[in-house]
Amino acid sequence: VDPLVQKLSGHDLFRTYCASCHGPTGAGDGPVAPSMRRKPANLRQIAKRNGGVYPSELVYRVIDGRQPVRGHGGPDMPVWGDVFARSSQVRDEAVITARIEALVRHLEALQARTAN
C-alpha cells in the first residue's frame, strides 16, 4: 500500500481534497463555494438527511464517483476514484479504497449531533 495513504488520516485527506469546496468543518462553506453553480452540500447533515442514519456505503459510492449515483454528487464534484488512481504511483485499487474509506469514516465523525 502507498506509504502516503498510511500517513494520511481521513481528516488530512478531507483538508487536502474536500475543504476548498465543503469548508474545513464540512458545512459547505469552503473558499471556492461562492464561485460554484451549485452550493456544496453540508456534509455535517448527511445522517440527518437520511433519517438519522449515516449511509456509509452510499457515501463511499458518491466520493468514489466512478459509478454515478443518481441524484448525488454532480458535475462540480470530481470523480475522486479517478483522481486517487492518477495520484497513486502504483494505481493500486487498495490505495484508492483506503483513501475513500478514510474519508467516509471522517465524514461520519463530522455528523452534527442532535439532542434527544
Predicted features by range, described:
Residues 26, 67, 111-112:
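Activation segment of ePK-like protein kinases, specifically the conserved APE
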Residues 1-6, 19-20, 24-46:
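His/Cys-centered metal/cofactor-coordination and adjacent catalytic loops
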Residues 1-6, 104-116:
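Post-cleavage N-terminal segment of exported redox proteins
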Residues 10, 14-24, 77, 103, ...:
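The canonical Cys-X-X-Cys-His
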Residues 30, 72-73, 116:
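Short, hydrophobic secondary-structure boundary micro-motifs
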